[in-house]
């Protein structure tokens, strides 16, 4: 089994050290209460180096019992949404590029996955049209998410066609992964359309994702 590890650049104790303001997390107690840029990028670098060292599988300082290294690193998640990152676009770009450089220096064969774009609504497109040119040299795989909204509506290609067009508009030619795929009905038709529009890999989130809940029977 291959692991795609998501890196979060914030920890409660670290954010408290420079009196960052609390933020509202979508996951309650299961998530940090602070979502801002690290107080110290030097300390954050130390964390990243130790994290990669523990899971890179090089035989030195590895996690006890590690049988398969982590190669795929997803840096942050949906930064255009304040529920996951309380910072400016410039803060995100700084953290992302910094993280990518540190990881690649420590683990040259690492594959960096772009922080997943939450959707392709106008506000998402505006954010990523600005951010992508600033980070495009620091990731290997482009990443889009599709979670149905409270009304249960879905995009028939799971946003992949709009995302591919956005990437082309900013001269980004990278594989596309759909790492959070939630469908509104039988998933096969949606997956086929996503693949035909350029998705290389789809990770299905099943029936337990955020958004309008869907029964297992409804997916058949």
Stretches found by the model and what they are:
Residues 2, 111, 140, 175-176, ...:
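Beta-sheet entry/capping signal
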Residues 115, 145, 176-182:
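Acidic/histidine-rich, metal-coordinating catalytic segments
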Residues 131-142, 193-203:
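Structural recognition of alpha->loop->beta junctions
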Residues 178-220:
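Aromatic/acidic polysaccharide-binding cleft in carbohydrate-active enzymes
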Residues 1-139, 145-149:
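Substrate-binding cleft and catalytic face of glycoside hydrolase catalytic domains
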Residues 152-156:
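Active-site-proximal cofactor/substrate-binding loop regions of enzyme domains
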């Amino acid at each position: 089994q291959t692991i795609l590890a998501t890196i979060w650049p914030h920890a409660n104790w670290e954010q408290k050290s420079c009196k960052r303001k609390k933020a509202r997390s979508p996951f309650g107690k299961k998530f940090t209460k602070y979502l801002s840029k690290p107080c110290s990028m030097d300390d954050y670098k130390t964390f990243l180096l130790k994290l990669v060292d523990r899971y890179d599988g090089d035989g030195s300082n590895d996690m006890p019992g590690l049988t398969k290294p982590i190669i795929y690193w997803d840096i942050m998640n949906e930064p255009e949404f304040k529920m996951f990152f309380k910072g400016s676009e410039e803060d995100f770009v700084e953290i992302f590029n910094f993280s990518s450089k540190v990881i690649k220096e420590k683990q040259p064969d690492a594959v960096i996955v772009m922080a997943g774009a939450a959707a392709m609504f106008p506000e998402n497109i505006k954010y990523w049209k600005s951010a992508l040119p600033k980070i495009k040299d620091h990731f290997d795989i482009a990443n889009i998410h599709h979670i149905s909204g409270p009304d249960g509506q879905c995009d028939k290609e799971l946003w992949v066609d709009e995302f591919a067009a956005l990437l082309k508009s900013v001269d980004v030619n990278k594989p596309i992964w759909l790492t959070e795929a939630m469908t509104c009905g039988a998933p096969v038709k949606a997956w086929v359309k996503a693949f035909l529009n350029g998705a290389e890999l789809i990770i299905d989130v099943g029936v337990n994702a955020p958004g309008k809940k869907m029964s297992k029977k409804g997916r058949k």
